[in-house]
Swiss-Prot record:
This protein's name: N-acetyl-gamma-glutamyl-phosphate reductase
Major location category of this protein: cytoplasm
GO CC, any one term: cytoplasm
Pathway assigned in UniProt: Amino-acid biosynthesis; L-arginine biosynthesis; N(2)-acetyl-L-ornithine from L-glutamate: step 3/4
Subcellular location: Cytoplasm
Length: 337
């Protein structure tokens, strides 16, 4: 089988690096285009971990050139930059998996939390790529909004329980992420003397992923729920651990509900005890555990924020869009010990 040509726009950051690593070894996709805002370097010089692995040139991003050479583009760009690039590539008949927030939300919510939207036409038909809940739509899609990392871990855990929640129940989400989730650019919070041996909340009750979680609960759960979202930065390189608390209508067997919903999902692992980051770091798996005490529900989920929360989820979405096996090229072995 001839490999399908694909490209990455935005190879300089952590998610771009993860895309590079997976696509360079993908059995059905050929990476023929890698770009950033400057170009003029090889991937091994841009990412020292790839020296001696690939001599692929990094080019200056050009939507026309990208569309000419690729059937599908992965956009690992900041919000607003992504929609500008995607709009032109889509107009040239190519498919896009966008890892930014530009196509994840309704117009009203996006503009309330980000900026004016510059591609309303494509926003209206973008598919939110949470595979276990949108597989059929993804297969038919031309544009995928790749979910955010916190929403991925939170939604996969709580969505099966929405029908069982008390009508007045809010969701309380305690989320902890490795520092790579803050991106490659150095900030005060990610500076080594700040984050080392430290743990703190940031953007409490105001993080941009809060409306994303709330909107998708309303989409798939058919009920609006108030989401109280508190993210924390941890002194870990990668990984994400989420605890979601809610109030049930009546006592349930929490693990039985998860087994019924996810029994045939190859990348959801249901655990018999609370989850841990070490078991998922370096993989595409989402591990979930849940328990209830009376009408109180606790859902515990873990993912690799750079993989299941970004780049491997993007690869899985592309696989489905291109008619390939969903799990092709996805990492399964954790970085353990």
């Amino acid at each position: 089988m001839k490999k399908i040509p694909v490209g990455i726009v935005g190879v300089s950051g952590y998610t771009g690096l993860e895309l590079l690593k997976m696509l360079l070894e993908h059995p059905y996709l050929e990476l023929v285009y890698a770009a950033n805002t400057e170009g003029g370097v090889r991937v091994g010089a841009l990412h020292s971990s790839l020296q001696g692995v690939s001599d692929l040139s990094v080019e200056k991003a050009d939507p026309k050139e990208a569309a000419k050479r690729c059937e599908l583009l992965f956009l690992a760009l900041p919000h607003q930059s992504a929609m500008e690039f995607a709009k032109e590539v889509l107009s040239l008949g190519k498919k896009v998996v966008d890892l930014s927030a530009d196509y994840r939300l309704s117009l009203e919510r996006y503009e309330a939390h980000y900026c004016p939207h510059l591609d309303k036409e494509n926003l209206s038909h973008a598919v939110y790529g949470l595979i276990e809940w949108a597989r059929e739509e993804i297969v038919q899609a031309r544009l995928i909004a790749n979910p955010g990392c916190y929403p991925t871990a939170t939604l996969l855990g709580i969505l099966p329980f929405i029908p069982y929640l008390d009508e007045d129940s809010s969701l309380f989400v305690d989320a902890k992420s490795g520092v790579s989730g803050a991106g490659k650019k150095l900030t005060h919070n990610t500076h080594y003397p700040t984050i080392n041996e430290n743990l703190f909340a940031y953007s409490p009750l105001s993080h941009r992923h809060e409306p994303e979680i709330a909107e998708k609960i309303e989409l798939w759960g058919k009920k609006a729920k108030k989401v109280n979202f508190i993210p924390h930065l941890t002194p870990l390189t990668r990984g994400m651990l989420v605890s979601t608390f809610a109030r049930l209508k009546e006592p349930v067997d929490a693990m039985a509900i998860l087994r019924e919903r996810y029994a045939n999902e190859p990348f959801i692992r249901l655990r018999s005890s609370p989850v841990e980051i070490k078991a998922v770091a370096g993989t595409h798996f989402c591990d979930i555990y849940a328990m209830s005490q009376g009408r109180d529900l606790w859902v515990n989920s873990a993912i690799d924020n750079l993989l299941r929360g970004a780049s491997s989820q993007a690869i899985a979405n592309a696989n489905l869009m291109l008619g390939l096996p969903e799990g092709a090229g996805l990492p399964r072995f954790a970085y353990a010990p």
